[in-house]
Amino acid sequence: MTNNDILIRLRYAFDIKNTEMVKIFNLGGMDYTKEEVLNMLIKVNDDEEAPEEYIKCNDKMLEGFLNGFITFKRGPQKPKPGQPEGPPAVSGKESPNNMLLKKVKIALALTSEEMLDILYDGGVSVSKGELGAILRNPSHRNYKECGDRFVRNFLRGLTYKYRD
């Protein structure tokens, strides 16, 4: 699952408009025009070649979008003295799938129980311990990398919960 697929599915799950997508990227510190964002949202199958205007979303772009999504959903946060302006950058060790789960959890202020319900709605049954392992810091000894199937089902569960 590519980062572009994640953007497309998040946009669908929360029914985010094109102008809101641009605003979310801007809130995350990324400056893109409406046309550039639309070019990121082009659906490309594995067996076909991407159109010339297609923009591949890298991990930094996805992280910027997710940081903007947190601000979009929760509002801007005033930094305390000595605290950095924005959210800390994710280390290169963390997979984009784990980053997605953590940042969506923060943006929607979800509890672990609510995340388990969303995953169940998406067709995955996991324990609280497994979810905790996915949400841990990559340097923790019990950290578990999140797979594409898990994220796909999480996004499906979000669609069921927030789209209907």
Language-model region placement:
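A cross-kingdom feature marking solvent-exposed beta-strand/loop segments within repeated
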Residues: 1-8, 16-57, 84-86, 118, ...
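Short, amphipathic alpha-helical "recognition" segments used to contact nucleic acids or chromatin
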Residues: 1-14, 95-107
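Intrinsic disorder/low-complexity detector
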Residues: 62-97, 164
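Short amphipathic alpha-helix initiation/capping segments at coil-to-helix junctions
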Residues: 94-97, 108-111, 124, 147
